[in-house]
């Protein structure tokens, strides 16, 4: 098992988030706190399949990019609101970070929906045949070709 940071440590290296993180503080966001920001995920393909959890090995760029985008939204709203109501802006940012962390944890642990793939080595989905799905998509695409009238 390996530690996975729900809010990636990469966030702390982004200067654009510096003012917000300087105000909030690394400890308040719980960057290294298992209860709020860390999740243990399998480090081997066999464990990932057995536990039905995402494989945590190597970089997970798409996940980090998605989280960076969400944090950018939080930071943008905080930047606008802090000029008029700094305390409200801080409280709102802290609440949104907590909600984001809970949502990320819940999504990574979910087994009913399509599993999150943190990296390309995740065995989930290996060997799946999408021929039938591709055929259905092709039929839908052909049915929506320009010039066809709705009936």
Please give the residue ranges for each predicted region.
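Histidine-centered nuclease catalytic patch
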Residues: 1-34
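C-terminal, well-folded lobe of enzymatic/effector domains
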Residues: 49-151
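Conserved beta-strand->loop/alpha-helix structural units within folded catalytic cores of enzymes
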Residues: 6, 43-45, 74-78
